[in-house]
From Swiss-Prot:
Keywords, alphabetical: Acetylation, Allosteric enzyme, ATP-binding, Cytoplasm, Deoxyribonucleotide synthesis, Disulfide bond, Nucleotide-binding, Oxidoreductase, Phosphoprotein
Reactions accelerated catalytically: a 2'-deoxyribonucleoside 5'-diphosphate + [thioredoxin]-disulfide + H2O = a ribonucleoside 5'-diphosphate + [thioredoxin]-dithiol
Localization of this protein: Cytoplasm
Species whose genome carries this gene: Mus musculus
Descriptive protein name: Ribonucleoside-diphosphate reductase large subunit
Site feature Important for hydrogen atom transfer, where: 218, 444
Origin organism lineage: Eukaryota, Metazoa, Chordata, Craniata, Vertebrata
GO BP terms in the entry: 2'-deoxyribonucleotide biosynthetic process; cell proliferation in forebrain; deoxyribonucleotide biosynthetic process; DNA repair; DNA synthesis involved in DNA repair; male gonad development; mitochondrial DNA replication; positive regulation of G0 to G1 transition
GO cellular component, one term: cytosol
UniProt site positions, description: Important for electron transfer: 737-738
Disulfide bridges in this chain: 218-444
NCBIfam families: NrdE_NrdA (TIGR02506)
Amino acid sequence: MHVIKRDGRQERVMFDKITSRIQKLCYGLNMDFVDPAQITMKVIQGLYSGVTTVELDTLAAETAATLTTKHPDYAILAARIAVSNLHKETKKVFSDVMEDLYNYINPHNGRHSPMVASSTLDIVMANKDRLNSAIIYDRDFSYNYFGFKTLERSYLLKINGKVAERPQHMLMRVSVGIHKEDIDAAIETYNLLSEKWFTHASPTLFNAGTNRPQLSSCFLLSMKDDSIEGIYDTLKQCALISKSAGGIGVAVSCIRATGSYIAGTNGNSNGLVPMLRVYNNTARYVDQGGNKRPGAFAIYLEPWHLDIFEFLDLKKNTGKEEQRARDLFFALWIPDLFMKRVETNQDWSLMCPNECPGLDEVWGEEFEKLYESYEKQGRVRKVVKAQQLWYAIIESQTETGTPYMLYKDSCNRKSNQQNLGTIKCSNLCTEIVEYTSKDEVAVCNLASLALNMYVTPEHTYDFEKLAEVTKVIVRNLNKIIDINYYPIPEAHLSNKRHRPIGIGVQGLADAFILMRYPFESPEAQLLNKQIFETIYYGALEASCELAKEYGPYETYEGSPVSKGILQYDMWNVAPTDLWDWKPLKEKIAKYGIRNSLLIAPMPTASTAQILGNNESIEPYTSNIYTRRVLSGEFQIVNPHLLKDLTERGLWNEEMKNQIIACNGSIQSIPEIPDDLKQLYKTVWEISQKTVLKMAAERGAFIDQSQSLNIHIAEPNYGKLTSMHFYGWKQGLKTGMYYLRTRPAANPIQFTLNKEKLKDKEKALKEEEEKERNTAAMVCSLENREECLMCGS
């Protein structure tokens, strides 16, 4: 049997040679657990004559990855094999790789199709000695296998389908793409990125330094006008943004309702649903080519709109196709008045914005006055019990996980952009809260701090370093505003005027584990607060320093910050004594700030996988999860838990199988000590009341909002109602992003004789179920505290 080498030569397959190659990459690993010969045995089983060394390495890496549950060092080894393979297949020198990317010729048409911008290449070539020598390739070996494979699959630039960049090249490309000729700043950013202190968002990693540097993650629009022109102009904006890979939030509350009169044609409107089906099809069609990533639109509606009940059905799996728009995402923009009326079981009036104009243009008391004046004037189209609509909302969430819940009055009352006008929606992921109008499409550029990195070996938290890195991020994101490619002019206008940015986090759960704090412990709750205080403090300080240099952002005057009111003041919260806010406030009073908004904890799905961290602000959902590779799927165990169990001599095959049998929970495994059980509770075992309380406590230092998922294993209408009202009363802006539920682990299979299941019985059951759900919902509204206790 022979193998084909990288240079095309053939060589006999040699067991020892494969073992030796793997052995060389085992430096620093625990050889009591890691067995290179075992990997070689499995690799040999998968061989065929004429296999290439690249395929051999890929197989060895996958084999090592499947052994991760034996010991976490196998995951490190798997990544090392894969990275070593990439290093053998790519050029080493950064400037050479950039030249190759620039000189790319498209094989289909023979044209020069540069993959990096000529300006980027010029800067790299002019500073190649400094940039080339700044790169430390060993840092590629610090990624875990799945982080590296994510980079390889989606982030590293390819030439004719073959990866041309190494991870370090990508990070330097991003750094130069942002900082241009400022080489000191580029190298500083490169070092922080490659040491994993923070990461820029995916669009920035994809596109920085390229010909079309579309580096923004989020776009927010409100309908240009309630007319055919307005609807289709807005649709075109959505299509152009989607083509450039932006996620979108659209406010549609101003669109007239079903049956509303249309003066131009003397006809009646078809309402929201047919319009949203057109948006749905555009989202499907504009997918960045080849279904790379389908367009993603979140549609925001206020609950007084006459079409609200139909809106709540749009994502359901059952029902007529022409009444559904399942590729869109749906969100409610909820005024406090609605929540008050649900709580007190009052009537709720549904209106058409064409007949009752301006409701989406006001908030708070002004909204309540206008809404109640329309009620008094008899302009309403339909009156329902507020709880009837609430029931429909909860029903939709239980079935589909959405609509998202955002509180319009909190979003406006606690916004530093409130001087611009009423904010009408959030974005696709519910953490961006920015002003939009017919002339302005709001934009946000994002980055996230890896919170696990700031835990010191002595189990203290390095707040100084956290503030320092936050300041670098502010400077980076502020630069991105100026160098960014904007798909539409309204986005350019808005971003240049208000200069908002969004700094988020990942690895909060990892930081708690490294500090040895259970997620719900008082220590974790204090650290949660202090982390976000620090980030907000550092961000304000950096933005103020930028304002000293370049002046405040254009619409600064009249904003709460310009009056000395910071986010925590709007929450009526005093910060801890970690930072001295008085001199910072004085500095801001003197110079202003460069960015209207700063903090926005977003979901961090892909970038957290790259850095090997738990997502965003979330607790761990499980201590074991499945990963797929070409050769099959296998279980990965929470690496912190694996390390702890290994150190205590508790890790073996039987333990692994017990954790799998318990669906990733360790609470009922007798051999595991209590301190570890406390530390490794999954989100299903943590009180959601605590999760919401911690969200509110950090919320006082978050000037945008946060992507906050609610996890209820088996939601009932009472639990869900309690969660929503608790979050609303805590002052959250985003009450819920997704409702995450847990499928039954082993659903019992029932075989029904369908002939015997009479329609009458079915209808009776549905009626009983509805009565039970309504009773649970009402009980929850009437006995808030008790219900919260039973509704973890």
